Amino acid sequence: MLWDGTRFQRDRRLLLDDDGRIAAVGSVSELEGDPERMHGAMMPGLINGHSHAFQFALRGRAERFGLVQGSFWSWRDAMYDLVDSLDADRCHELSLASFNEMIDHGVTSVGEFHYVRHDDAQDHRLDDAVMVAAEDAGIRMVKLVTCYQTGDIGKPLEGAQARFDTVSVDEYLRRLDAIQSRLDGHLQTVGMVAHSVRAVSIEDIVRLHRVSVERGLPFHIHVEEVLEEIESCQAAHGCTPMRLLLDRGVVTPNVVAIHCTHSQPEDMRDYVAAGGQVCLCPITEGNLGDGIADIPVMRECGASLSVGTDLNSRTDLLEELRWLEYVQRVARQKRGVIVDADGDTGRELLRIGTEGGARALGLDAGRIEAGALADLVLFDHEHDSLAAADEDELAAALIFGASGSVISRVIVDGVDT
């Protein structure tokens, strides 16, 4: 069976070319040749829109709270302790573990939002460690090179934050060019990032965004994950972070806002109208106690959604998609919050995890059609957890009833990983 963007269909065939792309898709009778026969259901590889691979090391480390309940900020303290001890070898080890696990769960592409570096701005060892890890794992990576300059709006970096410092926009752009020149050009590309309005001045965000548009690169930014970010921005600028970006023209179709947990409906409507996308990380937002995003408003105004594993406490994107819907059901006491025009939630979630992720990372992937990247996943549709589902039910059964354990084969760029 083959996913066609709306359902799984039997007796379909696809041909791959020598450049890692899909050459043709059709029925068994339409395409000639003696193809390899594969038993199972094939779909586009899942696309992880937002990852901090090194945070894989925090599993279990930040889950003890004593007499005081934790928060995003107490978790951040644990993350800073990790940052202080991170060297290139450890960064490679953690990144490789994250990427290998993603591959096992059917993720073929990842947006790696990397912001840790050595004190010397010319030292690229940690960037290199992440890139080598992705190459070793065989995963497609968009290296989201991050600008990070302040500890909060108008405040200097402190402590472990010194390892995030990009010094200036000019230095950031030199770093971006240097990293781009070192990539595996076939499986790795770059995107641009301003960490957040807390970590980059609005003037520099405007400049970075302008360069991203000129170069045709994705532009990612954390937006309104926690209430304190909004309060800080309102105190400094008299408006929310999202409104600040809108007022300064930093919203175009290449912009992806990460989280939007506490975004105001009117801000979100204007943001989507300007072409902005949203990447949600429901497992991380649940782990950190951030809150629940207003997905109905996003859907109502036609937002392009994707998902990411963020802190990588879990790297199973099927579980991430399941959480995306289930958290909304719990919050609203209703079922079927995220559905397509036919009222099907499984199919819509699968599109978010594939087509939506491809849009967020600027990849020609996430679909099975001629010309698209041959990043594919085969899973066992006769697995005990899926055997009762027919073709029309299979997407929902996969999202809500299975895990990465049903994945039997992962193909990236036309090659088995």
Feature roles, as predicted:
Residues 1-31, 41-42:
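N-terminal metal-binding scaffold of metallo-dependent hydrolase/deaminase domains
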Residues 119-261:
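Metal-coordinating catalytic core of metallo-dependent amide/deamination hydrolases
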Residues 57-91, 122, 150-170, 227-252, ...:
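Active-site gating loops and adjacent loop-to-helix segments of metal-dependent hydrolytic enzymes
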Residues 61-140, 170-185:
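Alpha-helical scaffold segments that flank or form the walls of functional sites
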Residues 44-56, 218-227:
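Histidine-centered catalytic micro-motifs
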